[in-house]
């Protein structure tokens, strides 16, 4: 659910992420295959994790350009956005690790 209460839909195999704009679902720029989690911060930026690629992206709310925050994990699963501390708490389930990922890049 985004900041306006709209649903966000991820296509696990195709890698598309759909968000509601002007009453219609529209894809964000980029491909996020294996998307597992999505969250939106107070500035409207999106964070998407990919279980299959072990990557987490930050997607700019205006330009929709994506920045890799972390990659090379065995499996980037659901995460917890701790915006007041400027981080995501991210489990790598396959490796048995939890990472604190800086979101202010």
Locate each region found by the language model.
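Beta-rich, blade/repeat-based domains predominating
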Residues: 1-14, 29-46, 51-53, 73-87, ...
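Structural motif
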Residues: 16-17, 55-57, 97-102
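Short, basic/aromatic-enriched C-terminal tail that caps enzymatic domains
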Residues: 89-105
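Short loop/turn segments that connect beta-strands within beta-propeller blades
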Residues: 19-24, 59-64, 102-105
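Short, well-ordered strand-loop elements centered on a beta-strand within folded domains, enriched
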Residues: 65-66, 87-89
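A short beta-strand motif characteristic of beta-propeller blades
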Residues: 23-30, 64-70
